[in-house]
């Protein structure tokens, strides 16, 4: 999530209404249940596809003291045009260099170095690294834990009278609706990068949210808050090294910085600068390291290797970043209709759409967010017509929800921009933050007008509760169904 203005926890119940009995155990239990389902999908369905072990191969290279993956097949060096998809087909398939980046006679992973660096200790200690499906599973579970922590913070600081089941339902939505559960069930190298990006962005956001309780205030001892902000900033920077699209999370840092400046008051300039450095400094430092690594490998601080990939088409001539790609890709990410199957569970991912890439829009197996995560619709319906009243009583929460929604939406735009093809794993970059924003909107609006019954929700809130629970059940069922092998 993002920055919030410091405020005491808001009680939204009438004085004569008994507080709901707290069963806080239901929240970690829900998170644990999500992780168990992730593990089941990873063990029963996931596959470590041949040619997708580029993270492990890069980690092994770093452990040996270099960045490039060795050896380079002699056949690749002798090709007149090593990037031509027809000429390099046999080498790509037979010599296990599919989707690696090739520049100046060296092979590299076409990804950032965050995951390989995390794997280096395993390489040094055991001479090997976990398979991609394990990396994906562990990272996804860490992301769910961080999302649960974020939602618990929201309740403690702003909506302290929320029943525990509502927070648990929000955790279930983030974990089981949308693409992340499906990503775990695939568990290849690209999915590992997506899952690590999810884990790091959620953890960074949670740390930043926690830091805002006193960061920028007049409290004389803010060292712990600065440490949390610095850790969150660094973790968001590392997320960029896992998924370059996560650079958009700099929006969260900008919101935090704005809050710090807004709270300045009579504080000395040196104190303000120290707070701002804690928020932005680590992200910038990590970003510089990423840029240097990119420049060393690919000659440009912004090139992660996609422009040099040995792929099913020539990436050196691929027309990247066309406006014409946005609309069809976004339509797929949001509204791709699931495919039909003749037996239980009767639905599956929409099949691959092929074509003459890149002139024709293509798609990997897909399902749109409105089908796999209909709680997003409930969150939007809750937030848009609610007016200012609910947010005026919890301005910090409104800031956080807006920052999460904006960042998630921009992530969907960013993944729709480079290539004329859509993929479910691309959707997973922005969906978690959108789900957090939807949950925040639901929890805020449903708590705005309590009843004397002690349910913590007004009449409109109870309707929202029913809508959320129905949408949650549908989203979980659909997301589970599309994982069943055909």
Annotate each PLM feature.
Residues 2-486:
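Membrane-proximal envelope and lipid/glycan-remodeling enzymes
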């Amino acid at each position: 999530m993002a920055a919030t203005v410091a405020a005491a926890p808001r009680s939204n119940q009438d004085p004569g209404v008994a507080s709901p009995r707290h069963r806080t155990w239901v929240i970690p239990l829900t998170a644990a249940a999500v992780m168990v389902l992730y593990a089941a999908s990873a063990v029963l369905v996931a596959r470590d596809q041949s040619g997708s072990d580029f993270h492990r191969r890069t980690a092994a290279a770093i452990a040996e003291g270099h960045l490039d993956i060795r050896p380079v097949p002699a056949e690749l060096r002798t090709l007149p045009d090593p990037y031509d998809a027809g000429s390099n087909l046999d080498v790509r398939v037979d010599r296990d260099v599919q989707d690696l980046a090739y520049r100046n006679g060296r092979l590299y992973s076409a990804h950032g170095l965050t995951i390989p660096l995390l794997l280096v200790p395993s390489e040094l200690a055991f001479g090997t690294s976990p398979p991609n499906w394990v990396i994906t599973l562990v990272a996804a579970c860490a992301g769910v834990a961080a999302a649960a922590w974020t939602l618990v913070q929201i309740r403690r600081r702003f909506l302290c009278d929320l029943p525990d089941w509502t927070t648990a339902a929000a955790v279930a939505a983030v974990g089981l609706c949308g693409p992340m559960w499906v990503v775990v069930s695939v568990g290849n190298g690209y999915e590992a990068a997506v899952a690590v990006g999810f884990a790091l962005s959620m953890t960074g956001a949670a740390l930043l949210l926690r830091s805002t309780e006193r960061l920028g205030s007049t409290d004389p001892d803010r060292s712990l808050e600065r440490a949390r902000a610095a850790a969150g900033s660094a973790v968001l920077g590392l997320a960029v090294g896992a998924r370059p699209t996560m650079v958009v999370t700099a929006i969260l840092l900008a919101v935090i910085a704005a809050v710090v400046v807004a709270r300045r008051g009579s504080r000395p300039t040196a104190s303000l600068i120290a707070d701002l450095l804690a928020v932005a400094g680590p992200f910038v430092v990590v970003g510089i390291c990423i840029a240097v690594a990119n420049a060393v490998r690919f000659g440009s601080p912004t090139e992660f290797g996609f422009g040099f990939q040995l792929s099913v088409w020539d990436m050196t001539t691929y027309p990247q970043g066309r406006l014409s790609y946005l609309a069809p890709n976004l339509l797929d990410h949001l509204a791709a209709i699931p495919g039909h199957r003749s037996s239980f569970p009767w639905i599956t991912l929409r099949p691959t759409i092929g074509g003459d890439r890149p002139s024709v829009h293509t798609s990997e197996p897909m399902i749109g967010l409105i089908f796999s995560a209909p709680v997003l619709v409930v969150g939007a319906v809750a937030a848009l017509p609610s007016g200012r009243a609910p947010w005026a009583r919890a301005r910090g929460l409104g800031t956080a929800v807006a920052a999460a929604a904006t960042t998630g939406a921009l992530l969907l735009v960013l993944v729709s921009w480079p290539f004329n093809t859509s993929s479910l794993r691309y959707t997973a970059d922005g969906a978690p933050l959108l789900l957090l924003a939807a949950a925040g909107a639901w929890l805020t609006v449903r708590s705005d007008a309590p009843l004397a019954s002690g349910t913590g929700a007004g009449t409109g809130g109870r309707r929202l509760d029913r809508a959320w629970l129905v949408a949650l059940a549908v989203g979980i069922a659909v997301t589970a169904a599309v994982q069943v092998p055909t």
